[in-house]
Amino acid sequence: MALRTRLGELLRPLNAEYGKVAPGWGTTPIMAVVMGAFLVFLLIILQIYNSSLIIENVDVDWTNGIV
């Protein structure tokens, strides 16, 4: 028999929802927005790395690193 703990009792409702699917699109639009925001973040980082996006007082000279 499994040991019953307070943490297990708190997490039991989450496990009861396992396998159930929300009707319709569910949270798909929210995930699409989050993925779009992450894409924009990655593009900004890439532009800073390529010096395509110039920001004042941000040095992107990678040759002066620690030797």
From Swiss-Prot:
Q: Which InterPro entries match?
A: PSII_PsbH (IPR001056), PSII_PsbH_sf (IPR036863)
A single GO cellular-component term on record: photosystem II
Q: Where found in the cell?
A: Plastid, Chloroplast thylakoid membrane
- Chain segments annotated as transmembrane: 29-49
GO terms in the biological process aspect are:
photosynthesis; protein stabilization
Q: Which Pfam families match?
A: PsbH
- UniProt keyword annotations, A-Z: Chloroplast, Membrane, Photosynthesis, Photosystem II, Plastid, Thylakoid, Transmembrane, Transmembrane helix
What GO molecular function annotations does the UniProt record carry, in alphabetical order? phosphate ion binding
Membrane topology note: Single-pass membrane protein
Task: State if Transport is listed as a keyword.
Answer: no
- The answer to whether UniProt assigns keyword Transmembrane helix to this entry is yes
What does it do? One of the components of the core complex of photosystem II (PSII), required for its stability and/or assembly. PSII is a light-driven water:plastoquinone oxidoreductase that uses light energy to abstract electrons from H(2)O, generating O(2) and a proton gradient subsequently used for ATP formation. It consists of a core antenna complex that captures photons, and an electron transfer chain that converts photonic excitation into a charge separation.
| Family the UniProt entry places it in | Belongs to the PsbH family.
Q: How does it assemble?
A: PSII is composed of 1 copy each of membrane proteins PsbA, PsbB, PsbC, PsbD, PsbE, PsbF, PsbH, PsbI, PsbJ, PsbK, PsbL, PsbM, PsbT, PsbX, PsbY, PsbZ, Psb30/Ycf12, at least 3 peripheral proteins of the oxygen-evolving complex and a large number of cofactors. It forms dimeric complexes.
What name does this protein carry?
A: Photosystem II reaction center protein H
Native source species: Phaeodactylum tricornutum (strain CCAP 1055/1)
Q: What's the name of its gene?
A: psbH
